[in-house]
C-alpha cells in the first residue's frame, strides 16, 4: 500500500525502498540495520533475524538499544554473517565512508545485498557528525572501491520532492522581522514579504510533496537522495 507524503515525500519513498527490501529478505535470513537509530523499520523485517548497530553518540537523539554499539568501520561480528545490510541516511555521518562500505562487504555473505540511501541535497544535521553529500558517481566509485557491485542506483524521490524540501527550508529560514532586513520602511516591507513567503512556503512544501508521490519527475533537476542496491 502506498504511503502518503504527509509533507515529506522522501520519508514515504524511503519506506517504499525498505518495504521492498523486506519483501526480498527470506524468512530466517539475517539482516543488519547499520546506523539504525530508533530502529523504526524493524517491523518490515519481522520475519528475519534483525540486528542493529549504532554508536549512540549524537546528543539529544533517541536510540533503540542496538545489538552492537560500535563504529560502522569495525562491526564486532565474524565475516559473512549477514544476508542483507540496510544503511539508510547514515553514510553522510561517517568520516570514513569507504572504510564503512568495505566493512559491509566483509560482514555480508557472498551474494548478500546492501540497501543504501544517501543524500545529495540536504542541510547540515546531527552536528558535528555530518561530513559529506554524494553524487551518483561518488556513490558508485565508493561502492566499487569497496568490492561491491552496483545492481541499482536511482533517485529516491523526484525533483518535486527536492523543491518541496527547499520550500520547507524557506518557510523556516527567512527572518520575519524588520531588523534582519535593515530596519526602516524597506526593512518592514521585506519582513512582511518574508512572513508571506514563509506561509506560502509551508503550503507549497505540502503540495509539492503530495505531487511528488503522484508524479515522480527524474529526467531533470536533482534529487534530495539516491537509493542503491549493491551486491557482494
Cite the ranges covered by each PLM segment:
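Class I SAM-dependent methyltransferase Rossmann-like catalytic core
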Residues: 1-25
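Conserved short-loop catalytic and cofactor-binding motifs
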Residues: 2, 6, 88, 127
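Short, surface-exposed alpha-helical recognition segments that flank or form part
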Residues: 5-9, 92, 218
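Short gly/ser/thr-rich secondary-structure transition/capping motifs
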Residues: 12-16, 33-35, 67, 209-212
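Conserved SAM-binding loop
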Residues: 19-125, 135-140, 228-230
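S-adenosyl-L-methionine-dependent methyltransferase catalytic module, highlighting the catalytic core
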Residues: 98-99, 103, 109, 113-231
Amino acid at each position: 500500500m502506498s504511503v502518503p507524503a504527509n509533507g515529506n515525500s522522501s520519508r514515504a519513498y524511503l519506506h517504499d525502498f525498505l518495504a521492498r527490501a523486506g519483501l526480498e529478505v527470506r524468512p530466517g535470513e539475517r539482516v543488519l540495520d547499520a546506523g539504525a537509530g530508533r530502529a523504526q523499520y524493524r517491523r518490515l523485517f519481522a520475519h528475519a533475524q534483525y540486528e542493529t548497530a549504532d554508536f549512540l553518540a549524537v546528543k539529544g537523539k533517541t536510540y533503540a538499544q542496538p545489538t552492537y554499539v560500535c563504529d560502522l568501520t569495525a562491526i564486532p561480528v565474524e565475516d559473512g554473517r549477514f544476508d542483507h545490510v540496510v544503511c539508510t541516511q547514515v553514510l553522510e555521518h561517517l568520516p570514513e565512508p569507504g572504510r564503512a562500505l568495505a566493512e559491509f562487504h566483509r560482514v555480508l555473505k557472498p551474494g548478500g545485498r546492501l540497501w543504501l540511501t544517501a543524500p545529495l541535497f540536504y542541510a547540515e544535521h546531527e552536528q558535528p557528525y555530518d561530513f559529506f553529500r554524494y553524487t551518483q558517481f561518488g556513490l558508485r566509485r565508493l561502492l566499487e572501491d569497496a568490492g561491491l557491485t552496483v545492481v541499482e542506483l536511482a533517485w529516491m524521490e523526484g525533483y518535486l520532492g527536492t523543491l518541496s524540501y527547499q520550500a520547507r527550508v524557506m518557510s523556516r529560514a527567512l527572518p520575519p522581522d524588520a531588523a534582519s532586513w535593515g530596519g526602516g520602511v524597506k526593512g518592514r516591507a521585506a519582513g512582511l514579504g518574508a512572513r508571506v513567503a514563509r506561509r506560502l512556503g509551508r503550503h507549497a512544501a505540502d503540495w509539492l510533496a503530495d505531487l511528488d508521490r503522484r508524479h515522480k519527475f527524474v529526467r531533470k533537476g536533482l534529487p534530495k537522495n539516491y537509493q542503491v542496491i549493491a551486491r557482494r
